[in-house]
Amino acid sequence: MTPTVLLLILCFGVASGAQAHDPKLDAEWKDWKTKYAKSYSPKEEALRRAVWEENMRMIKLHNKENSLGKNNFTMKMNKFGDQTSEEFRKSIDNIPIPAAMTDPHAQNHVSIGLPDYKDWREEGYVTPVRNQGKCGSCWAFAAAGAIEGQMFWKTGNLTPLSVQNLLDCSKTVGNKGCQSGTAHQAFEYVLKNKGLEAEATYPYEGKDGPCRYRSENASANITDYVNLPPNELYLWVAVASIGPVSAAIDASHDSFRFYNGGIYYEPNCSSYFVNHAVLVVGYGSEGDVKDGNNYWLIKNSWGEEWGMNGYMQIAKDHNNHCGIASLASYPNIF
């Protein structure tokens, strides 16, 4: 295909999108742009409006099916509304799973004695939801959240820890700042560094910067860390008895980015390819646990406007759904 033909097709697509705009959505589109401070050139606005309307139609269709009992969760428009599916997927990078954590033959049996419900928020282990912005720092938020919980267990004080400290300084152990990283490498950094600053002394900037760690400002430290086998049983034991656990999931689907509430189950989710780090802060079930409507409660880093005030219920005991147990780890503080 020649560049000229490609340009004509792109221009035709924009023009067609402009003609197809639904005037009934004018007010919603204007309100959405205001809410998220969106500003476009005339040509760009035509394209983004078309994408936004397509996403709006998808959300409304999904929610209609939810009202008919065809799925267990709802969706809503949010800050990702003007992105295509491909653009959204490109904004989250695949997280490599070390070979030591990909053994599919871990023993799976019914564990006796574990509670059917846990929510570490109710026991004071979890700091408020934050927003990573355009930086790919999910791994740092997940790591900081797990350390925050263990520091609360040890000291009785809940202190937001510095995500920026992890972004800027853990490149020495393999993380890549806003580009990508893993929580267990962040734990490795804190272990070797013998300290991590608080958010108050090393605030979040949402971009890469030079390492500015000051040992006199250290607010947390860890003794070691544990990488869990990729099996939901091990994750269950850890979340039930240890505290919030860092994990990673396949978050590349439209259903995830527009999630609103309910137990998330995405048939196309991968159990082996993960691209977004989260913090598992509990688990439970809707109705009787024997009915199989079990969920993990995860804390995201996309702000309180996303999901259930920044949280999601994701299907539990569904063959490692979305890879929830594929890259789980937690720090120890003795």
Swiss-Prot record:
Location in the cell: Lysosome
Species this chain originates from: Mus musculus (Mouse)
UniProt enzyme class: hydrolase
Proregion positions: 18-113
Database matches in SUPFAM superfamilies: Cysteine proteinases (SSF54001)
Signal sequence region: 1-17
GO biological process: proteolysis
SMART domains from the UniProt entry: Inhibitor_I29 (SM00848), Pept_C1 (SM00645)
Protein name, per record: Cathepsin J
GO molecular function, one term: endopeptidase activity
UniProt entry tagged with the keyword Metal-binding: no
